[in-house]
Amino acid sequence: MNKKILLVIFIVTMLIVDEVNSFKFGSFIKRMWRSKLAKKLRAKGKELLRDYANRVLSPEEEAAAPAPVPAKRRR
């Protein structure tokens, strides 16, 4: 299963659990925010954002690295 399907299953499960325990939308959001999955997603998002910001702020480092030239083969 891919991550999108697992995320949908997780949200639906949380909705069912909340409905059984008298649904309160605020507690549902709080529970989702504190879940392990949400923490992993936030950490991954922060990491990707940090990497993107570093690439945008310092593009000269990438441009300075020349592309490797393929060596000519002898026959």
Swiss-Prot record:
Similarity section: Belongs to the non-disulfide-bridged peptide (NDBP) superfamily. Long chain multifunctional peptide (group 2) family.
Molecular-function GO term, any one: toxin activity
Signal peptide positions on this chain: 1-22
Protein name as it appears in the record: Meucin-49
BP terms from Gene Ontology: defense response to bacterium; defense response to fungus; killing of cells of another organism
Organism: Mesobuthus eupeus
Tissue: Expressed by the venom gland.
GO cellular component: extracellular region
Keywords attached to this entry: Antibiotic, Antimicrobial, Cleavage on pair of basic residues, Cytolysis, Fungicide, Secreted, Signal, Toxin
Compartments, as annotated in UniProt: Secreted
Domain notes: Amphipathic and cationic peptide with an alpha-helical structure.
Protein's job: Insecticidal toxin and antimicrobial peptide with potent activity against both Gram-negative and -positive bacteria, as well as against fungi. Acts by disrupting bacterial membrane integrity. Shows broad-spectrum and highly potent bactericidal activities against the Gram-positive bacteria B.cereus, B.megaterium, B.subtilis, M.luteus, S.aureus, S.epidermidis, S.warneri, S.griseus, S.scabiei, S.mutans, S.salivarius, and S.sanguinis.
